[in-house]
């Protein structure tokens, strides 16, 4: 396992649309493990592959309910709306209020290539939306109001 340096705002990979994963190889499994190690080392609740410099459609999320790994995730259903404060490991020292769907259903593949569908609400729904935005080259600051800079 390895902890990678998180890519920060200004790096062009964060503006790219990440490439779909066509085959789940041992390298993809290793990527998921390294992403989780990195997320935990940085005390994050989610991480997308582009945040460690890899243009692949993979995310890891853990909001305190256990690690979720998703390959080629997509949001298939949304409902409601709520505004809350977000931050991002790739935009250190910055927070802002972002309006997101209150509930989402996310579909993707697990590390075994099995399709999984996850209904989510609250922080988990927000984390999924935030990380999937990363896969589409979108940073939270592009959607945020009341942006505040905090000490690093």
UniProtKB/Swiss-Prot annotation:
GO terms for biological process: co-translational protein modification; translation. It catalyses: N-terminal N-formyl-L-methionyl-[peptide] + H2O = N-terminal L-methionyl-[peptide] + formate. InterPro entries: Peptide_deformylase, Peptide_deformylase_sf. The active site is at residue 131. Keywords: Hydrolase, Iron, Metal-binding, Protein biosynthesis. Its cofactor is Fe(2+). Fe cation binds at residues 88, 130, 134. This is Peptide deformylase.
